[in-house]
Design a protein with these regions (language model features):
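Cystatin/cathelin-like cysteine-protease inhibitor module
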Residues: 19-114
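Sec-dependent bacterial lipoprotein signal peptides
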Residues: 1-19
Length: 114
């Protein structure tokens, strides 16, 4: 019985950590869209936060060049990136984008319109 309690507590803590991570990513993306892209958006949905190691420096540079000029992106620290996809409305247009966040999820490293 004691093992079951420990496992239950561990799973509960893991769930709370994952929820906090999801909320942190959403907040960073919303701030980025409002401040850097200067779009007043209504958010429809977000995917779950996930990790990737496939974002090489050349891919990040290419993604940054596709977007508007003058955007301040977060610095990439390490190889791992987090990403989240968002569907949102701007002026009655439905947009979809993938946002790549630094590992600590403090800022957007790059994004791409889907």
């Amino acid at each position: 019985m004691r093992i079951n309690n420990i496992i239950g507590i561990g799973l509960t803590l893991l769930l709370f950590a994952a929820c906090g991570q999801q909320q942190q990513a959403k907040s960073v993306v919303k701030d980025f869209v409002a401040d850097c892209l200067q779009q007043d958006a209504d958010y429809l949905d977000f995917t779950d936060v996930d990790s990737t190691l496939s974002g090489s420096d050349s891919v990040i540079t290419a993604l940054r060049q596709q977007g508007p000029k003058g955007i301040q992106y977060a610095e990439r620290k390490g190889k791992a990136l987090k990403y989240i996809r968002a569907n949102y409305l701007v002026n009655d247009d439905t947009l979809s984008a993938t946002f790549y966040l630094d590992a600590e999820m403090t800022g957007v490293v790059a994004y791409k319109q889907n």
